[in-house]
Amino acid sequence: MAVPKIVLFYVFTPLADPEAIRLWQYTLAEAHDLTGRILVSEHGINATVGGDIRDVKRYVKGTRSYAPFKDADIKWSDGLGNDFPRLSVKVRPEIVTFGAPGELKVDADGVVGGGTHLAPEEVHRLVEGRGDDVVFFDGRNGFEAEIGRFRDAVVPDVSTTRDFVHELDSGKYDHLKDKAVVTYCTGGVRCEVLSSLMRSRGFGEVYQLDGGIVRYGEAFGDTGLWEGSLYVFDKRMTIEFSDQAKTLGRCTRCGGPTSRYENLPDDRGRELVLVCAGCTENRAG
Protein backbone atom coordinates (compact mmCIF):
# COMPACT_ATOMS: atom_id res chain seq x y z
CA MET A 1 0.00 0.00 0.00
CA ALA A 2 1.39 3.38 -1.03
CA VAL A 3 2.16 5.82 1.77
CA PRO A 4 2.44 9.34 0.31
CA LYS A 5 5.07 11.59 1.86
CA ILE A 6 6.43 15.06 1.14
CA VAL A 7 9.94 16.27 1.93
CA LEU A 8 11.12 19.84 2.14
CA PHE A 9 14.78 20.85 2.33
CA TYR A 10 17.35 23.39 1.26
CA VAL A 11 21.12 23.75 1.36
CA PHE A 12 23.04 26.97 0.88
CA THR A 13 26.47 26.07 -0.49
CA PRO A 14 28.52 27.21 -3.49
CA LEU A 15 27.72 25.15 -6.60
CA ALA A 16 30.18 25.59 -9.45
CA ASP A 17 27.95 23.90 -12.04
CA PRO A 18 24.24 24.41 -11.24
CA GLU A 19 23.19 22.89 -14.57
CA ALA A 20 24.94 19.62 -13.74
CA ILE A 21 23.18 19.55 -10.37
CA ARG A 22 19.86 20.23 -12.12
CA LEU A 23 20.33 17.30 -14.51
CA TRP A 24 21.36 14.98 -11.67
CA GLN A 25 18.43 16.01 -9.48
CA TYR A 26 15.94 15.64 -12.32
CA THR A 27 17.25 12.18 -13.17
CA LEU A 28 17.22 11.12 -9.52
CA ALA A 29 13.71 12.39 -8.79
CA GLU A 30 12.25 11.10 -12.06
CA ALA A 31 13.75 7.65 -11.49
CA HIS A 32 11.78 7.41 -8.26
CA ASP A 33 8.51 8.77 -9.70
CA LEU A 34 8.59 11.92 -7.59
CA THR A 35 6.81 15.16 -8.35
CA GLY A 36 7.42 18.63 -6.97
CA ARG A 37 9.66 21.61 -7.42
CA ILE A 38 13.45 21.81 -7.19
CA LEU A 39 15.36 25.06 -7.69
CA VAL A 40 19.12 25.15 -8.14
CA SER A 41 21.45 28.15 -8.29
CA GLU A 42 25.09 28.93 -7.69
CA HIS A 43 24.04 29.46 -4.05
CA GLY A 44 22.58 25.97 -3.46
CA ILE A 45 19.37 23.97 -3.73
CA ASN A 46 15.76 24.39 -2.53
CA ALA A 47 13.42 21.42 -2.96
CA THR A 48 9.93 20.21 -2.15
CA VAL A 49 9.05 16.82 -3.60
CA GLY A 50 6.58 14.06 -2.89
CA GLY A 51 5.81 10.44 -3.66
CA ASP A 52 5.56 7.05 -2.05
CA ILE A 53 7.60 6.85 1.15
CA ARG A 54 9.94 4.17 -0.22
CA ASP A 55 10.73 6.23 -3.31
CA VAL A 56 11.17 9.41 -1.30
CA LYS A 57 13.62 7.66 1.04
CA ARG A 58 15.68 6.50 -1.95
CA TYR A 59 15.70 10.02 -3.35
CA VAL A 60 16.83 11.47 -0.01
CA LYS A 61 19.59 8.88 0.28
CA GLY A 62 20.76 9.68 -3.24
CA THR A 63 20.70 13.42 -2.61
CA ARG A 64 22.71 13.06 0.59
CA SER A 65 25.32 11.01 -1.25
CA TYR A 66 26.57 14.31 -2.70
CA ALA A 67 28.98 15.67 -0.09
CA PRO A 68 27.73 19.31 -0.02
CA PHE A 69 24.18 18.02 0.64
CA LYS A 70 25.02 15.27 3.14
CA ASP A 71 23.83 17.29 6.16
CA ALA A 72 20.61 18.57 4.57
CA ASP A 73 17.84 19.03 7.16
CA ILE A 74 15.03 16.97 5.62
CA LYS A 75 11.55 17.89 6.84
CA TRP A 76 8.99 15.12 6.37
CA SER A 77 5.22 15.42 6.28
CA ASP A 78 2.24 13.34 5.21
CA GLY A 79 1.08 13.82 1.64
CA LEU A 80 -2.23 13.19 -0.07
CA GLY A 81 -0.85 11.51 -3.18
CA ASN A 82 -0.39 13.48 -6.40
CA ASP A 83 0.41 16.53 -4.29
CA PHE A 84 2.16 18.26 -7.19
CA PRO A 85 1.07 18.40 -10.84
CA ARG A 86 4.50 17.51 -12.22
CA LEU A 87 8.23 17.40 -11.56
CA SER A 88 9.97 20.73 -12.18
CA VAL A 89 13.74 21.11 -11.77
CA LYS A 90 15.17 24.47 -12.83
CA VAL A 91 18.27 26.62 -12.55
CA ARG A 92 17.52 30.12 -11.29
CA PRO A 93 19.62 33.10 -10.15
CA GLU A 94 18.22 32.55 -6.63
CA ILE A 95 16.80 29.48 -4.88
CA VAL A 96 14.33 31.80 -3.17
CA THR A 97 13.47 34.88 -5.20
CA PHE A 98 14.16 38.09 -3.31
CA GLY A 99 15.42 39.84 -6.43
CA ALA A 100 18.80 40.47 -4.82
CA PRO A 101 21.15 37.69 -5.94
CA GLY A 102 24.13 40.04 -5.80
CA GLU A 103 23.63 40.68 -2.09
CA LEU A 104 23.72 37.03 -1.04
CA LYS A 105 27.05 35.47 -0.12
CA VAL A 106 27.44 31.79 0.70
CA ASP A 107 30.29 29.50 1.65
CA ALA A 108 30.55 25.84 2.60
CA ASP A 109 28.94 26.64 5.97
CA GLY A 110 25.89 28.35 4.46
CA VAL A 111 24.80 31.98 4.18
CA VAL A 112 27.47 34.48 5.16
CA GLY A 113 26.19 37.19 7.51
CA GLY A 114 22.78 35.67 8.17
CA GLY A 115 20.88 35.72 11.44
CA THR A 116 21.78 33.46 14.34
CA HIS A 117 19.96 30.14 14.18
CA LEU A 118 17.73 29.38 17.17
CA ALA A 119 16.06 26.04 17.83
CA PRO A 120 12.41 26.25 18.95
CA GLU A 121 13.41 25.73 22.59
CA GLU A 122 15.99 28.52 22.32
CA VAL A 123 13.35 30.87 20.93
CA HIS A 124 11.24 30.22 24.02
CA ARG A 125 14.18 30.94 26.31
CA LEU A 126 14.87 34.18 24.44
CA VAL A 127 11.25 35.31 24.83
CA GLU A 128 11.16 34.30 28.49
CA GLY A 129 14.34 36.23 29.20
CA ARG A 130 13.76 39.33 27.09
CA GLY A 131 9.97 39.70 26.95
CA ASP A 132 8.72 42.56 24.79
CA ASP A 133 12.25 43.22 23.53
CA VAL A 134 11.77 40.20 21.24
CA VAL A 135 9.88 40.74 17.98
CA PHE A 136 8.76 37.99 15.60
CA PHE A 137 9.13 39.04 11.96
CA ASP A 138 7.20 37.07 9.34
CA GLY A 139 9.32 36.18 6.31
CA ARG A 140 6.47 34.83 4.17
CA ASN A 141 4.02 36.29 1.69
CA GLY A 142 1.35 38.33 3.41
CA PHE A 143 -1.53 36.01 2.55
CA GLU A 144 0.17 33.11 4.33
CA ALA A 145 -0.02 34.98 7.63
CA GLU A 146 -3.78 35.42 7.30
CA ILE A 147 -4.31 31.89 8.60
CA GLY A 148 -1.35 31.46 10.93
CA ARG A 149 1.45 33.44 12.55
CA PHE A 150 3.43 33.83 15.74
CA ARG A 151 1.69 35.75 18.47
CA ASP A 152 2.04 39.55 18.01
CA ALA A 153 4.29 39.06 14.98
CA VAL A 154 5.17 41.85 12.59
CA VAL A 155 3.69 40.88 9.21
CA PRO A 156 5.18 42.94 6.37
CA ASP A 157 2.90 44.08 3.56
CA VAL A 158 4.36 41.85 0.85
CA SER A 159 2.71 39.88 -1.93
CA THR A 160 5.90 38.05 -2.94
CA THR A 161 9.41 37.72 -1.54
CA ARG A 162 10.53 40.24 -4.16
CA ASP A 163 8.76 42.93 -2.11
CA PHE A 164 10.93 42.48 0.98
CA VAL A 165 13.90 44.53 -0.21
CA HIS A 166 11.67 47.55 -0.86
CA GLU A 167 9.91 47.03 2.47
CA LEU A 168 13.17 46.95 4.39
CA ASP A 169 14.55 49.96 2.50
CA SER A 170 11.36 51.97 3.13
CA GLY A 171 12.36 52.66 6.73
CA LYS A 172 9.04 51.50 8.18
CA TYR A 173 10.79 48.85 10.28
CA ASP A 174 13.75 50.94 11.42
CA HIS A 175 12.26 51.10 14.93
CA LEU A 176 13.08 47.40 15.22
CA LYS A 177 16.79 47.83 14.62
CA ASP A 178 17.52 47.83 18.35
CA LYS A 179 15.19 44.91 19.08
CA ALA A 180 15.87 41.18 19.13
CA VAL A 181 14.23 40.23 15.82
CA VAL A 182 13.31 36.58 15.23
CA THR A 183 12.59 35.92 11.56
CA TYR A 184 10.49 32.91 10.65
CA CYS A 185 9.07 31.22 7.55
CA THR A 186 7.74 27.81 6.53
CA GLY A 187 10.89 25.71 6.47
CA GLY A 188 13.66 28.24 7.02
CA VAL A 189 14.97 28.98 3.54
CA ARG A 190 13.41 32.44 3.15
CA CYS A 191 14.73 33.54 6.53
CA GLU A 192 18.27 32.58 5.58
CA VAL A 193 18.16 35.33 2.98
CA LEU A 194 15.85 37.74 4.81
CA SER A 195 17.97 37.74 7.96
CA SER A 196 21.11 38.51 5.96
CA LEU A 197 19.33 41.38 4.18
CA MET A 198 18.20 42.77 7.54
CA ARG A 199 21.65 42.56 9.08
CA SER A 200 23.23 44.32 6.11
CA ARG A 201 20.68 47.12 6.62
CA GLY A 202 21.57 47.80 10.22
CA PHE A 203 19.33 45.48 12.21
CA GLY A 204 21.64 44.73 15.08
CA GLU A 205 20.28 41.53 16.62
CA VAL A 206 18.69 39.20 14.10
CA TYR A 207 17.79 35.56 14.61
CA GLN A 208 16.15 32.94 12.44
CA LEU A 209 13.93 30.10 13.60
CA ASP A 210 15.94 27.01 12.74
CA GLY A 211 13.86 24.65 10.62
CA GLY A 212 11.11 27.22 10.33
CA ILE A 213 7.51 26.87 11.43
CA VAL A 214 7.58 23.19 10.48
CA ARG A 215 10.21 22.33 13.11
CA TYR A 216 8.54 24.59 15.67
CA GLY A 217 5.22 22.84 15.13
CA GLU A 218 6.85 19.46 15.56
CA ALA A 219 8.30 20.60 18.89
CA PHE A 220 5.39 22.51 20.41
CA GLY A 221 2.31 21.90 18.27
CA ASP A 222 -0.32 24.45 19.32
CA THR A 223 0.87 24.79 22.91
CA GLY A 224 3.51 27.44 22.26
CA LEU A 225 3.71 30.82 20.56
CA TRP A 226 2.45 29.75 17.13
CA GLU A 227 -1.23 30.32 16.40
CA GLY A 228 -3.34 29.01 13.54
CA SER A 229 -2.67 26.94 10.41
CA LEU A 230 0.34 26.74 8.12
CA TYR A 231 0.01 27.44 4.40
CA VAL A 232 1.96 25.01 2.21
CA PHE A 233 2.66 25.18 -1.51
CA ASP A 234 1.15 21.89 -2.62
CA LYS A 235 -2.21 20.19 -3.04
CA ARG A 236 -2.83 20.19 0.74
CA MET A 237 -2.67 24.02 0.87
CA THR A 238 -2.87 24.09 4.68
CA ILE A 239 -1.76 21.90 7.57
CA GLU A 240 -2.39 22.04 11.31
CA PHE A 241 -0.10 20.80 14.07
CA SER A 242 -2.95 19.50 16.23
CA ASP A 243 -6.73 19.49 16.50
CA GLN A 244 -6.37 22.42 18.91
CA ALA A 245 -5.25 24.84 16.19
CA LYS A 246 -6.92 28.25 16.26
CA THR A 247 -8.76 29.48 13.18
CA LEU A 248 -7.42 32.96 12.40
CA GLY A 249 -8.52 33.36 8.79
CA ARG A 250 -11.78 34.98 7.72
CA CYS A 251 -13.95 33.96 4.78
CA THR A 252 -13.90 36.59 2.04
CA ARG A 253 -17.60 35.92 1.38
CA CYS A 254 -19.27 35.88 4.80
CA GLY A 255 -16.52 36.90 7.21
CA GLY A 256 -16.79 33.68 9.19
CA PRO A 257 -13.75 31.83 10.54
CA THR A 258 -11.91 29.58 8.10
CA SER A 259 -8.43 28.40 7.13
CA ARG A 260 -9.67 27.05 3.81
CA TYR A 261 -8.14 28.46 0.62
CA GLU A 262 -9.60 28.13 -2.86
CA ASN A 263 -8.31 29.23 -6.24
CA LEU A 264 -11.06 31.71 -7.10
CA PRO A 265 -10.96 35.27 -8.45
CA ASP A 266 -12.09 37.98 -6.05
CA ASP A 267 -12.67 41.73 -6.27
CA ARG A 268 -8.98 42.38 -5.62
CA GLY A 269 -7.96 40.31 -8.62
CA ARG A 270 -6.32 37.65 -6.47
CA GLU A 271 -7.10 34.04 -7.30
CA LEU A 272 -6.12 32.42 -4.00
CA VAL A 273 -8.79 33.39 -1.47
CA LEU A 274 -10.16 32.23 1.85
CA VAL A 275 -13.62 30.71 1.42
CA CYS A 276 -15.41 28.70 4.09
CA ALA A 277 -17.04 25.36 3.30
CA GLY A 278 -20.51 26.83 3.79
CA CYS A 279 -20.03 29.52 1.17
CA THR A 280 -18.57 26.98 -1.24
CA GLU A 281 -21.64 24.78 -0.80
CA ASN A 282 -24.00 27.74 -1.27
CA ARG A 283 -22.20 28.76 -4.45
CA ALA A 284 -22.35 25.21 -5.81
CA GLY A 285 -26.04 24.97 -4.98
Curated annotation (Swiss-Prot):
Q: Which residues form the Rhodanese domain?
A: 130-225
Q: Which UniProt keywords apply?
A: Oxidoreductase, tRNA processing
Q: Which CDD domains match?
A: RHOD_YceA
Q: What class of enzyme is it?
A: oxidoreductase
Q: What is its EC number?
A: 1.14.-.-
GO molecular function annotation? oxidoreductase activity, acting on paired donors, with incorporation or reduction of molecular oxygen
A single GO BP: tRNA modification
Q: Which InterPro entries match?
A: Rhodanese-like_dom (IPR001763), Rhodanese-like_dom_sf (IPR036873), Rhodanese_C (IPR022111), TrhO (IPR020936), TRHO_N (IPR040503)
Under SMART domains, the record lists:
RHOD (SM00450)
Q: Which PROSITE patterns match?
A: RHODANESE_3
Active site per UniProt: 185
The record's catalysed reaction(s) read: uridine(34) in tRNA + AH2 + O2 = 5-hydroxyuridine(34) in tRNA + A + H2O
Name of the protein this chain belongs to: tRNA uridine(34) hydroxylase
Organism name: Rhodococcus opacus (strain B4)
